[in-house]
Amino acid sequence: MTEKLIRKVWIAVSAAILWGCGDASSYTAVDGVMLGTTLHITADVQGVSAQELYAAAMELDREAKASMSIFDPGSLLSRLNRNETDSVYRHIAFNLHLADSIGALSGGRYDVTVKPLVEAWGFAGRQAERHPDVDSILAFVGREKVRVEEGRLVKADPRVQLDFNSIAKGYTVDLLARLVESFGARNYIVDIGGEVRCKGGNRQGGPWRIGIETPFDGNMSDGEYVQKRIRLTDGGLATSGNYRRFYLDADGNKVAHTIDPRTGRSAVSRLLSVTVAAPTCAEADALGTMFLAMGADDALKAVRTMPDVKVYFILADEADGYEEYISPAMEAMIMQ
């Protein structure tokens, strides 16, 4: 089936679970908070209560934040960024390895050394600088400026800082899925803040259904508007967009949280939403950020050279409407 741009739609950005599974009495369901956002688990775990499953998830939550959080000053990543340690343990090592793989596809648009730029633009817990000195900051941004040698992080410049926010949530979803499987689950869906990993199907034997929301700039409602439904039986899915984390600068220009590390500036284009399905949620998470940072034209060119990549883009058109792009590999997963 050939790729195509199809009818105009409203913006669809974040992924939400559609729990239309019928009677799920044989499944254990957990709802809570993880990584500071929503947590949902539905799984046919064996011999474990919802309370025990949630407690195990909270232990993983503490482990993930202690390693990869840029907001926790005591995390390993924060201490690496402040040059208080150079030790690289497994979570950091995995994130760096995946970042290198995605970065190689990105033409320089995906780079986890962007933290100083993210801070300057006000998206890492600091107030935005009125006129960030982008050129000066770019002098110590670049994946080539940091390497790992025998389990130690070596920086070419001590000002280099890492930010794994484009991977860490998806990676934690994958860790949570592994945890659920350790409790005997053969069918499950886990969701942290709209990033999803699933296996098998619902109690009736059908696929899990993931809803792609139809929000708009500033919309904070989860799951109220659904543009597309995607069937998923194995793997990860993540949706990236710039409709929640943005602000208008003094000149009225939109400044979004996705930063192009080549220019040091916000990557705002007519590409409004990117949904990626991949074998792991970490891959889907990182690829979504990569495509957003590329912008509409380059993202469309890139994905057309990747026949196995499963993506769903929503783009603004010139008439204040919207268009969809569904890659050939994704088409069979679209339910409507």
Model-derived regions, located:
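Mature catalytic core of soluble alpha/beta enzymes
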Residues: T2-W10, W19-Q336
